[in-house]
């Protein structure tokens, strides 16, 4: 609600809850999003919340990452190895199961696509092999059974996103993007971006 209000009605400023300058001077405020509202006003479908436990045993939030959270693939891989090596710990301590994460992510992406869409196509958009989280991008795309693409693999034609394939262009219905906002679309944001998709925003 906060982000949608900031980019649309701006009631939080009109009601003097917080000063405009606090938001508008932030390096993360994107003036290009002014007047924009995503489907269901869901500005963040996925968030990475880092928790720590203090000496009293309380859980505290160390960091919120709403832009491009990463690390889930390492946690999933680590959990698989730990379950194989120390199965008794999982039984004794009733460790929560997390292996359904790729399925839940897949379903989250499906929810972003209109129900009437037949045979929807989805993909994971990666900055490329040089990115530190490339392993995760590849891991998630494989686990979900969807394409892993780079910006050069996509193009926009008449406001529709297409993927280049050996059989020609393929309409893309949902993208799980793993690159920062500013690099997403060189027409809308950082003009020098070589990893984004012109016209995607």
Regions found by a protein language model. Give the residues of each.
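Domain-scale recognition of functional cores that engage charged ligands
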Residues: 1-201
């Amino acid at each position: 609600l906060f982000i949608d209000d900031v980019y649309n009605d701006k009631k939080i400023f009109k009601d003097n809850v917080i000063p405009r300058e606090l938001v508008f001077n932030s390096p993360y405020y994107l003036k290009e999003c002014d007047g924009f509202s995503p489907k269901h006003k869901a500005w963040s479908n996925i968030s990475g919340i880092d928790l720590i436990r203090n000496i009293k045993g309380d859980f505290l939030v160390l960091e919120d990452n709403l832009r491009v959270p990463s690390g889930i693939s390492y946690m999933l891989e680590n959990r698989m190895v730990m379950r194989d090596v120390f199965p008794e710990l999982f039984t004794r301590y009733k460790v929560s199961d997390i292996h359904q994460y790729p399925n839940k992510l897949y379903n989250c992406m499906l929810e972003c696509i209109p129900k009437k869409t037949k045979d929807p196509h989805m993909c994971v958009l990666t900055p490329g092999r040089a990115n530190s989280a490339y392993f995760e991008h590849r891991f998630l795309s494989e686990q979900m059974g969807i394409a892993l693409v780079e910006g050069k693999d996509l193009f926009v034609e008449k406001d529709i996103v297409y993927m280049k394939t050996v059989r020609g262009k393929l309409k893309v219905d949902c993208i799980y993007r793993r690159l920062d906002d500013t690099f997403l679309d060189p027409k809308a944001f950082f003009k020098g971006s070589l990893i984004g998709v012109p016209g995607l925003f």
